[in-house]
């Protein structure tokens, strides 16, 4: 009887180890996919942004990461749709950031 309990414990432990390894592999694959996507986004941004515009976007990313991510994704989509034909300079980047910031800005009103 004690041997049966040990066998059950051993099987259960092996099952748990197997599940853990499968989860770990799935997580590693997801991280690898995310890194690949991020590398592709950065490659596209290097192609369409001047160094000054990339620098501005990097500074915005430090302060407002959500806004910077949104701008990156919009620029990539526009590039893939063929709507960006020339490099975006710092002045254009300022306009883009201002437009997107205005669109996503939330107003807070306090009523008494």
UniProtKB/Swiss-Prot annotation:
Q: Which InterPro entries match?
A: DNA_bind_arc, PDCD5-like, PDCD5-like_sf
Q: What cellular component terms from Gene Ontology apply here?
A: cytosol
Q: So which residues are the signal peptide here?
A: none
Q: What is this protein called?
A: DNA-binding protein PF1087
**Organism lineage:** Archaea, Methanobacteriati, Methanobacteriota, Thermococci, Thermococcales
Q: List the disulfide bonds.
A: none
Recorded source organism is Pyrococcus furiosus (strain ATCC 43587 / DSM 3638 / JCM 8422 / Vc1)
Instruction: Name the UniProt key words of this record, in alphabetical order.
Output: DNA-binding
Q: Which domain of life is it from?
A: Archaea
Where does the sequence pass through the membrane? none
Gene Ontology MF terms in the entry: DNA binding
Name the protein family.
Answer: Belongs to the PDCD5 family.
